[in-house]
Design a protein with these regions (language model features):
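Glycoside hydrolase catalytic-domain context in secreted enzymes
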Residues: 1-403
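Conserved small/polar residues in nucleotide/adenosyl-binding loops
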Residues: 405-407
Length: 407
């Protein structure tokens, strides 16, 4: 169990939830007060869901209180297909929006955390995606300090973010999750970070599989723990038991991480008697409630940026009697949700929205025009709902490797 939950723009992979615009859209609002409110709503739903899961005896992945959001990497490289998860290319805007998001997630109780927020991915993790497991980032000292680190520093020193996720890539030859320069000298010693560090999934494996900086899981794990990576998403830390027996690391070294992890659980109120946790009173009825939907709609409206309005086409004239909607995105509900998303109780496509908005005497015609991905068929399935430990059958998949010839 690696404490994995997601809420990049709404509680994700845990059933019905209020879905906000993707992070890049939230940044386009330039409204950190509104984002603080949105994050507070998200954390309300996360708390309500967690306590309902506990009542049902469920404590699996995506059912906890430690959330791997926000993503405060800098969207500098357009080849990074996951740039929409970030707040864009500007370090200052990213700092402001990330700070608001963390404050909304973690709450304002002086003694307890509403959720654990996680600032990720530390550091210089900005695509391309395909080589992230072996890439060596070599920014100048100025670029590192001026571009890639400010948002993390803000979230640590002003937001008291409870967790940081270390990145897959290397920085100046050292895997980030084993970097003394990043995690000890900068994060803990210089900035005063008191929380815990969690690895990205499989990042410790990368030390010896792809970076080739360490020989095996044991040596990689020892290095990661000593550099302050307290929790691993993956399996390499299983080797730490053998490392202790071999004298490569001590139990007290492990206890340093253990204490940080238990402190996070205590701050979440997980050891309090029933009724004493200030956040257990949040009712499940808040999940995807009407007020939350209205707030998400308002954020979506604020996120829209008009780049061009040729011949003052917008707003549309009420004299129009026929509107043509062209393109596959008009009816694609999946693309509306982004990634790391929840499942809304109600979803309206662009075409449906236009047809509902116009008067009955306006004809709306639709033409798909082209496919989004050539002629591939894509059938969306919420697979995360099938990956729960409920004793039921899982997913059956057949894999085909065929050479297709166009005739």
């Amino acid at each position: 169990y690696n404490w994995w939950n997601e809420c990049l723009h709404g509680v994700a992979r845990a059933g019905i939830a209020t879905v906000y615009p993707q992070a890049i859209g939230l940044a386009a609002t330039f409204d950190d007060d509104a984002l603080l409110r949105a994050a507070s709503i998200i954390s309300d739903e996360a708390r309500a869901k967690h306590h309902q899961f506990v009542r049902e005896g469920q404590r699996g992945i995506y059912q906890g209180l430690t959330y791997w959001s926000p993503n405060i990497n800098i969207f500098r490289d357009p080849r990074w297909g996951r740039g929409q998860e970030t707040y864009g290319e500007d370090p200052y805007l990213t700092s402001r929006m990330g700070l608001a998001f963390v404050r909304g997630l973690q709450g304002d109780d002086p003694n307890y955390l509403k959720l654990v927020a996680t600032a990720k991915h530390f550091a210089v993790h900005s695509g391309p995606e395909y080589d992230r497991h072996h890439f060596n980032a070599t920014p100048s000292r100025y670029d590192l300090a001026d571009t890639y680190l400010p948002a993390f520093q803000t979230l640590v020193q002003q937001g008291s973010v409870a967790s940081v996720m270390c990145a897959y890539n290397r920085l100046d030859g050292e895997p980030c999750c084993g970097s003394d320069a990043l995690q000890v000298e900068i994060l803990r010693d210089r900035w005063g970070f008191k929380g815990y560090i969690v690895s990205d999934c499989g990042a410790i494996d990368d030390f010896y599989k792809y970076h080739k900086t360490y020989a095996d899981a044991k040596s990689a794990s020892v290095k990661a723990v000593r550099a302050g990576t307290d929790l691993e998403c993956g399996g390499s830390y299983e080797s730490l038991k053998e490392a202790v027996r071999d004298g490569k690391i001590t139990e007290e070294d492990l206890n340093v991480s253990l204490r940080r992890l238990f402190l996070a659980r205590m701050k979440l109120g997980l050891f309090l008697p029933e009724g004493e946790n200030p956040y257990t009173a949040i009712p499940y009825s808040v999940v995807d409630c009407e007020q939350h939907r209205k707030d998400a709609l308002e954020m979506a409206r604020k996120s829209i940026v008009l780049l061009k309005n040729e011949n003052n086409l917008l707003p549309l004239s009420k004299k129009l009697r026929k509107i043509a909607v062209i393109g596959p995105a008009a009816t694609d509900s999946v693309s509306l949700l982004g990634n790391y998303n929840g499942t809304p109780g109600k979803l309206t496509t662009f075409l449906e929205g236009i047809r509902r908005k116009v008067s009955s005497d306006v004809e709306v015609v639709y033409e798909k025009g082209v496919n989004l991905t050539d002629d591939n068929m894509f059938y969306p399935v919420d697979i995360w709902q099938l990956l729960q430990s409920k004793g039921s059958k899982g997913v059956h998949a057949d894999y085909f490797n065929l050479s297709l010839i166009h005739i």
